[in-house]
């Protein structure tokens, strides 16, 4: 899994390849398709009594739920937090909310901006939850990738398209698949 993430990043394609290997695939050819729609990150769903705020920005690399939990109350450079990139299943190390007010969450494409002032501090136990959506490719880019793959002259059992798709894409893929037989 680690080697796949090194090659493909924290992406839906990496997730699909890892799932395939874990379920018995012995050979995988992975062809990333350039995103045409950037990932999106929601506004914070804040639970708790603190008045400090956190905003998320950037272009998420995958679908995930990002949670910031305040561990120690206070202003920036005093309050501490932990961050989960998987909806609270696991947590990163406790870190001080920096005076520079931003934390870049590694391998996610997301930067968090923290704001606090006297009377508007972070409070221990508060959580800030963000929903991220993965980037997406358009139908034309996916079809071009399948055509490019065809030029590799390798025998394949199936082609797995990762991401959101439409009926129009599947109709086009069916026609292309028939031509490839």
Q: What feature does the model see in each segment?
A:
Residues 1-181:
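Surface-exposed assembly/interface segments
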């Amino acid at each position: 899994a680690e080697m796949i993430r090194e090659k493909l990043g924290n992406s839906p394609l990496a997730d699909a390849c890892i799932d395939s290997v874990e379920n018995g695939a012995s050979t995988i050819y992975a062809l990333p398709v350039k995103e045409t729609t950037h990932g999106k990150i929601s506004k914070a769903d804040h639970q708790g009594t603190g008045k400090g705020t956190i905003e998320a920005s950037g272009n998420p690399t995958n679908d995930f739920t990002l949670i910031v939990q305040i561990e120690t109350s206070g202003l920036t450079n005093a309050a501490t937090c932990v961050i989960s990139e998987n909806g609270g299943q696991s947590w990163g190390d406790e870190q001080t909310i920096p005076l520079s007010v931003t934390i870049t969450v590694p391998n996610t494409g997301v930067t968090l901006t923290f704001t606090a002032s006297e009377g508007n501090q972070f409070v221990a136990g508060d959580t800030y939850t963000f929903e991220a959506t993965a980037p997406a490719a358009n139908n034309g880019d996916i079809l071009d990738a399948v055509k490019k793959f065809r030029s590799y002259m390798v025998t394949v059992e199936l082609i797995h398209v990762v991401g959101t798709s439409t009926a129009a894409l599947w109709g086009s893929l069916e026609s292309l698949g028939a031509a490839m037989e």
